[in-house]
Amino acid sequence: MKKHGMLNSHIAKVLADLGHTDLIAIADAGLPVPDGAPKIDLSLTAGVPAFRDVTSLVAGEMAVEKVIAASEIKDANPENASFIESHFSAQTIEYMSHEEFKRLTQKAKAVIRTGEMTPYANCILQAGVIF
């Protein structure tokens, strides 16, 4: 049995398989997952697990080069927008329209669905390298 780090075997495998510039999406409960995109559904009930918790844990297990979010989060969900800005202050943060964001999830190696029930609480983490 694994003792440390990411215990969810599906997420651990995706993280281990990431290469430079690969994408992994962390989504609220309402984000549509494109057909064919691998979905890891962690949602248990409204708000559990939270977007911030899942994002922090996943990001802590990988080299993050860039974070992508919908520009709408800034006005519709300032608390989670502030979280993204502060948690990823050392990384590039790119904003795009929610429609563009949804299209980009088609390229994600996985979409991790949380129980988050606040608007636009989604981000895409682009893998960096550790050397």
From Swiss-Prot:
Pfam families (alphabetical): RbsD_FucU
Enzymatic reactions: beta-D-ribopyranose = beta-D-ribofuranose
Top-level class of the enzyme under EC nomenclature: isomerase
Residues that, per the record, bind substrate: 28, 98, 120-122
Top-level taxon in the UniProt lineage: Bacteria
Compartments, record wording: Cytoplasm
EC assignment: 5.4.99.62
Keywords: Carbohydrate metabolism, Cytoplasm, Isomerase
UniProt keyword Cell division, yes or no: no
Alphabetized GO MF terms: D-ribose pyranase activity; intramolecular lyase activity; monosaccharide binding
BP-aspect Gene Ontology terms: D-ribose catabolic process
Catalytic residue positions: 20
Similarity comment text for this entry: Belongs to the RbsD / FucU family. RbsD subfamily.
Function: Catalyzes the interconversion of beta-pyran and beta-furan forms of D-ribose.
NCBIfam families in UniProt: PRK11797.1
Assembly with partners or alone: Homodecamer.
PANTHER family: D-RIBOSE PYRANASE
Name of protein: D-ribose pyranase
Organism: Bacillus velezensis (strain DSM 23117 / BGSC 10A6 / LMG 26770 / FZB42)
Source taxonomy: Bacteria, Bacillati, Bacillota, Bacilli, Bacillales
